[in-house]
Curated annotation (Swiss-Prot):
It comes from the Bacteria. The gene is trhO. GO terms for molecular function: oxidoreductase activity, acting on paired donors, with incorporation or reduction of molecular oxygen. NCBIfam families: PRK00142.1-3 (NF001135), PRK00142.1-4 (NF001136). The keyword Manganese does not apply. It comes from Legionella pneumophila (strain Corby). Its EC number is 1.14.-.-. SMART domains: RHOD. GO terms for biological process: tRNA modification. The lineage of its organism: Bacteria, Pseudomonadati, Pseudomonadota, Gammaproteobacteria, Legionellales. It catalyses: uridine(34) in tRNA + AH2 + O2 = 5-hydroxyuridine(34) in tRNA + A + H2O. This is tRNA uridine(34) hydroxylase.
Length: 254
């Protein structure tokens, strides 16, 4: 019985007091019994956590009680056990580390496409379909005809753009990632560089898998997730794939 709710969320918003938010949030997680990881930075908040329905609703209400987080959107998936072993709240320079200054997805991100819009859009042969995730994620599964940037971590993505895409600023470029946060940054970064037509899959691969019937899906393989499930299939059920020997669970989190 899948009675554990796993929620992922993020929001790009200036948080001048982000350091002072750590202890209250961590205390509340312990109090409620929520497990997972939340990352705070000056640019916003990002996280994934899990619990039963009652615990999750209490924690949602707590987070949204801060007016800056009143509109937080939590993307839910479900499992029979909690994929996190403890509660963590981390302070970072970025909520997802790309290492490029002055990229602000809060106002300059690419055009959102719903799963249904995305499904049609990426079948256009003139669209450049780009996977923004890491090499080991791509190897587990990706969209049909997607380009692999062959990067070990997200910090390498800007260099990939400079080496391979800088002469394609007038092309339609569709980007995707697991839950959407990396695409917020990649599309904003590319718009800053002058790319004119950049699009992103709203709420990421997980939203597509939930929305598009498997019989029609353009997704091939499994989808890596950053918790103890390791990966999920097209039904969003956990699987235990054979990962490459150089796989490092914390690589994207550093």
């Amino acid at each position: 019985m899948k009675d554990i709710i796993i929620a992922s969320f993020y929001k790009f918003i200036p948080l001048n007091d982000f350091e002072s938010l750590r202890e209250p949030i961590l205390t509340k997680m312990h109090e409620i019994g929520i497990k997972g990881t939340i990352i705070l930075a000056h640019e916003g908040v990002n996280g994934g956590f899990a619990g039963n329905r009652e615990q999750m609703n209490v924690f949602y209400d707590y987070l949204r009680s801060d007016s800056r987080f009143a509109d937080l959107h939590f993307k839910e998936t479900y499992d029979s056990k909690n994929p996190f072993d403890k509660a963590k709240v981390k302070l970072r320079k970025e909520i997802v580390t790309m290492g490029v200054q002055k990229v602000d997805p809060s106002y300059n991100a690419g055009t959102y496409l719903s799963p249904e819009e995305w499904h049609q859009f990426i079948q256009d042969p003139n669209v450049i379909l780009l996977d923004t995730r890491n090499d080991y994620e791509y190897e587990l599964g990706t969209f049909k005809n997607a380009i692999n940037p062959d990067i070990e971590n997200f910090r390498e993505f800007p260099d990939y753009v400079q080496r391979n895409l800088i002469d394609k600023k007038d092309k339609k470029i569709a980007m995707f990632c697991t839950g959407g946060i990396r695409c917020e940054k990649t599309t904003a970064y590319m718009k800053e560089l002058g790319f004119q037509h950049v699009y992103q899959l709203h709420d990421g691969i997980l939203n597509y898998l939930e929305s598009i019937p498997e019989s029609e899906s353009l997704w091939e393989g499994k989808c890596f997730v950053f918790d103890d499930r390791v990966a999920v299939d097209q039904k969003l059920d956990r699987v235990y794939p054979q990962l490459p020997q150089d796989y490092k669970y914390e690589r994207e989190q550093k």
